[in-house]
Amino acid sequence: MYDTIVVLDFGSQYSQLITRRVREAQVYCEMFPWNVDAARVMAMQPRGFILSGGPNSIYAPGAPQLPAFVLESGLPVLGICYGMQALTRALGGVVAASSEGEYGLAQIETLLPNPLLPPGIQPVWMSHGDRIESLPT
């Protein structure tokens, strides 16, 4: 049996790239739309989830929401952009509209050792109009 990561697509133009990069790391990865049937995903016995970005605001009418089975699974979850906002909101944090959007290159710094990210500063691309105002408690 393979270790499997599931990417849930919230409409990002980069979802295919994310899936491919996971596969290039020698990890089996499948991508599904955010509203996929839970039984279909959980039958794959994934080891974790990646939630993609997307063009919506988390508070827009009809905006995609985090499927309950993701948190109920107890598996590790990586939220990217909209996926992070959906995760934050589902866990009780607050997401708010930014006064202006931010687009372009940025840097993130890994402060604590972890198996997913290398230590130090990494270049990243950002494109968002909402922000995390307060983290879940």
Question: Which functions belong to the PLM regions below?
Answer:
Residues 4-25:
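Short, charged N-terminal beta->alpha structural module
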Residues 5, 29, 77:
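Hydrophobic anchor at the start of a short beta-strand
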Residues 7, 126-127:
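Short beta-strand segments
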Residues 8-10, 34, 82:
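Cofactor-binding loop segments of dinucleotide-utilizing enzymes, especially the Rossmann-like FAD-
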Residues 13, 37, 85:
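Conserved Rossmann-like nucleotide-cofactor binding loop
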Residues 20-26, 43-116, 120-123, 129-132:
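Cysteine-nucleophile active-site neighborhood
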Residues 26-42:
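A short, well-structured beta->alpha microelement
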Residues 135-137:
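Short, intrinsically disordered, charge-balanced linker/junction segments flanking boundaries
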